[in-house]
Amino acid sequence: MARKTPLKRYRNIGIVAHVDAGKTTTTERVLFYTGLSHKVGEVHDGAATMDWMEQEQERGITITSAATTCFWQGMNKQFDEHRINIIDTPGHVDFTIEVERSLRVLDGAVVVLCGSSGVQPQTETVWRQANKYEVPRMVFVNKMDRAGADYFMVLDQLKQKLGANTVPIQINWGAEDDFKGVIDLIQMKGILWDEANHGMNYELVEIPDELKESAAKYREQMVEAAAEASEELMDKYLEEGDLSEADIKAGLRRRTLDNEIVLVTCGSAFKNKGVQAVLDGVIEYMPSPTEVKAIEGELDDKDGTIATREADDSAPFAALAFKIATDPFVGTLTFIRVYSGVLKSGDSIFNSVKSKKERVGRIVQMHSNSREEIKEVYAGDIAACIGLKDVTTGDTLCDLNDKIILERMEFPDPVISVAVEPKSKPDQEKMGTALGKLAQEDPSFRVKTDEETGQTIISGMGELHLDIIVDRLRREFKVDANIGKPQVAYRETIRASVEQEGKFVRQSGGRGQYGHVLLRIEPLTAEDKGEDEDMTFKFASEIVGGVVPKEYVPAVEKGAYEQLQNGVIAGYPMIDVKVTLFDGSYHDVDSNETAFKVASSMAIKEGAPKAKAVLLEPVMKVEVVTPEEFMGDVMGDLNRRRGLVQGMDDSPSGKIIRATVPLAEMFGYATDLRSQTQGRASYTMEFADYEEAPSSVVEAVINQNG
């Protein structure tokens, strides 16, 4: 079966937004218009359309489906049919890892902002991640019909807060209750969508007099931005004073793909205005898989040679598993982005991260209103595989004879843990299975059993993250469980440097044990870390002349690392420690790896307490958006929680307070903030760093851990 859509007509995009910017409605409208345009013959009247949308909402596809495939030919059927794969991204900061993972497999992104609240703290986080992966993006300013909507304020915020080089290709026609449509600056016409049939039709009209001046000003800026794409366009612009429609679009496209500019459009998804033009923009200005940088990976050789995989069907198969979802009907769905080659159902492939062979059962593609089983997928495709056994998020799937690891995904360590206990015996068995499935789906969520108490402990990125896990246990897996008090993931470190001997000798007839090391234990510096900011442990060997044979050095490192997982103050893992093996001795017969591992752990156990060990606590970056009249209460409360206010900004809904607060003080904050501000304030929180805990906290932690 040959490829239906040529690769240059593919668009893999994400719709990214802050929680309340209207992403779900925007996505729903995208599915609505594309679903209709693809099956336009089947819809004879409005009723069928709306039924389909309600059913869609009941099934909640925009929330649960990790990737949806739809088709679009343009508002005026002016394009050949393009295939748009939409990858869903969550809006809440507890799921930042999910956003980052989805940005990894996108080629372009549409960032949805609210016309009245503008750039929110979360938007900044997502924008930073999109910069990191160099994702070309365009912005849709939504909710232009809302009270307080101000398109030009949002444009200003994009520049000020995100440093975005924005180029509006539309301006709004009216706002709030008077929002009528948009002015298209390329055609220099007004666009009015037909409200009677949900915006399926539109008309181009002359620009009203009161907007002519503003439209001319922004058009000039847009044409200049397009002209800067090349010398040829600039010469043409300087000669003629304007550019043709085709030249403007070509210039804007080129600069968008090079991440030099961000195009901005506006509308109201709820009122069926503007989303249709966003879809046209995706085709005209977002990249196809062949227009982005070829993905890099490590070859399966000893040197970890870097290789690239071009978006090409004839190249060896390589794909990234970017999300695992549990489906009540088919079991585990593994969503993959195919970067190169072709995969057929029934094929055997290799999971290069886990070094395991896998067989693909079935392959399905999610469409806006159905699930289609397909026989094969090609480079650039996004689909879900059924039947993969040991694949987790971030794994690479590749050709058995051409192995490559596309990336080693770094997942942050959880910062909060709670104990969960099933309410009944039948729940016990179901809970184990359910938690296993949820952990497979989400690598930033961990499950373990406490060896001393036998309790099941779940850990995640924040209170909301764990609340949602518990909610899913109840809703999807029908498991009722009680939740314990949240526990904080403390760490320990050292502030001084010591040298410590470790000697393990056992001689009792026959073969004995002999390991002897001298270790330098010292704080890990920024210089030691170099570019790897996330490094928490470093081992070095200064052994010369073989006083400790080379083959035992890895055992010394292992012994040191494992012992550092049991801190000296309250048993928490020790981080930011550098251990150097600088001397030792061995025995020809009695020395072995185990003896050196034990000697090394003895040296750490004795040496670490002498190196001025301290307890570290996770500190969170907190942003609170509050009406001005509650500012005093909110600030006072943050101070009581040992918070340090870093600064304040104005926002349309009051003030934004930026602070750092220890996680231990943030439990239950959502409820407290609601009652202090009559439910009018909101906050976001993300992990910032580990900092030394004050003595009162250290005492409490030691007493709690007995």
From Swiss-Prot:
GO BP: ribosome disassembly
GO molecular function: GTP binding; GTPase activity; guanosine tetraphosphate binding; translation elongation factor activity
Span of domain tr-type G: 8-290
Major subcellular location class: cytoplasm
SUPFAM superfamilies reported for this sequence: EF-G C-terminal domain-like (SSF54980), P-loop containing nucleoside triphosphate hydrolases (SSF52540), Ribosomal protein S5 domain 2-like (SSF54211), Translation proteins (SSF50447)
Pfam family for this entry, one: GTP_EFTU
Function: Catalyzes the GTP-dependent ribosomal translocation step during translation elongation. During this step, the ribosome changes from the pre-translocational (PRE) to the post-translocational (POST) state as the newly formed A-site-bound peptidyl-tRNA and P-site-bound deacylated tRNA move to the P and E sites, respectively. Catalyzes the coordinated movement of the two tRNA molecules, the mRNA and conformational changes in the ribosome.
Protein name: Elongation factor G
Organism: Chromohalobacter salexigens (strain ATCC BAA-138 / DSM 3043 / CIP 106854 / NCIMB 13768 / 1H11)
